[in-house]
Amino acid sequence: MALETMTLSLSSSAMLSSGVVEDDKKQEAIVFPKFVLMGHRGFGMNMLQSPDEKMKFIKENSLLSFNVAADFPIDFIEFDVQVTRDGCPVIFHDIFMFTQEQGVIIEKRVTEMDLHEFLSYGPQRDGTNVKPMWRKTKDGRIFEWKVEKDDPLCTLEDAFLNVKHSLGFNIELKFDDNTVYGEGELRQTLDNILTVVNEHSKNRPIIFSSFHPDAARLIRNMQRCYPVFFLTNGGCEIYKDVRRNSLDEAIKLCKESGLQGLVSEVKAILRTPNAITRVKDSKLSLLSYGQLNNVVEVIYLQYLMGVEGVIVDMVKDISEAIANIEVTNEDDCEGEDERKCLIRFGEERKKVEITKDMITLLNKFVPKLL
């Protein structure tokens, strides 16, 4: 099914993405017309330390990665946006950029660079390589950023101008977990991002998301055209800000801030499946992310549990699995309008209750993965 069926509800300026008029501050869930598939950082994130060559195939968060992902039946790409010192929104996941000069590894904060310096890292459009890129893992190891198919760094504007227009953007508002931001600083960063979005979005489906509770709250207050989702580890990691430490805290934040839904680490959903009911009862939409989303069986399980979409790295493999789900629905709905049929199935998934049989399945299957 084409993504265009989602476009009105996610990008219309006349109506909120949740289907309420702009002067109505009421929070409502997004109604996705199908199970939603999103490519993580395009065609998938890079894990330079991984023995799996698929994790080192195409440079993440690049135009090449976005456009390769667009060749598959996915609905959105997810990518990370930060703002340079001179106010330009750029697409890059890590807080720090690493390079090597005369055998010494040097780091620099992305938001402390101007645009020209940021774009000087990695391969260039003219074929040169001005500054080699390295990457630091969570455990402190540093790897040269080598992938099979490299591509230059890009800006948010580049993505709008060069990626297939029907492909939705899940724009993650990226902030440093270890930095305390004032509201004025957050607003300035978000305003720079909104300026580009408003100028170039046209009718492209767009979602904003962020792990930063106040950034999510503010972007919702600063605009009413695009849905905002709160990203949460759901307690898989613990932070000083308690709003980040459980699914129930995430639900509370969404309700208080008028957000449309949350994007949870899949492990948190599998560990506390009854939280899905609380999400639905709160009229919130639920998506998931995490490495377990590269396991087909986990995707099927979430579909049955009522999760409405997933962010994945293995775009090719998982898109085929999702296609099988949708084909099954279409067969069951023979003679019905496709869109109405899939919405009906979506509504049924929202009403799914966690049964004893499902708990038994989770207890047998999930511990092997977590």
UniProtKB/Swiss-Prot annotation:
It catalyses: a sn-glycero-3-phosphodiester + H2O = an alcohol + sn-glycerol 3-phosphate + H(+). Keywords: Glycerol metabolism, Hydrolase. Its EC number is 3.1.4.46. Pfam families: GDPD (PF03009). One of its GO terms (biological process) is glycerol metabolic process. Residues 35-322 form the GP-PDE domain. Induction: By phosphate starvation. Expressed in flowers and siliques. GO terms for molecular function: glycerophosphodiester phosphodiesterase activity. It comes from the Eukaryota. Belongs to the glycerophosphoryl diester phosphodiesterase family. PANTHER family: GLYCEROPHOSPHODIESTER PHOSPHODIESTERASE GDPD3, GLYCEROPHOSPHORYL DIESTER PHOSPHODIESTERASE. This is Glycerophosphodiester phosphodiesterase GDPD3.
